[in-house]
Amino acid sequence: MGSGTRETTTQEGALRRLFSFPNPVNEVSARLVAAAVVVMCVLAIAFDLEWMTVLLAYGFVARVLTGPTLSPLGQLVTRVITPRLGVRERPVAGPPKRFAQGIGAAFSLTALVLAGLGHWTAAEVFLALLALAALLESAFALCLGCKAFAVLMRVGVVPDEVCERCTNIWATTPGAAA
């Protein structure tokens, strides 16, 4: 019975590691992923690539659930692109980034459902909003989801324990904790 318990514990640990989100997050990688999201959204809108919504939605859901682990884009950025840039890591708090990925998942899943129902123009609106938010993140380190997370912390919806590093998010330099 002892080895079965050990095996179960090992499996639980593996699942816990799989379904974890990095904390801290390298802001350089986060901004590169955001830049790729901008490109994907713009291509989808410009060329009516409805199938691109599947890739976007999968990517956001994968990143919310597992960080970059099950996200092909996350893997490409964290394992290939960022290391080759030769720039210093810029660690920022993980929970606000995960929350932002969740908002991206909601927008991309909405676009996917709308596209699937034949409402491509409505889907394009959600893709355009997603592209705008990703552009702000990638170009200016302005993470709208992170700012929303900070507001939710400030009003007590998100407890301080969720992200102790975030408790003074407004006083930090842009992008440092958001």
Question: Residue locations for each model-derived region?
Answer:
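Membrane-interfacial helix-loop segments of redox and metal-homeostasis proteins
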Residues: M1-A178
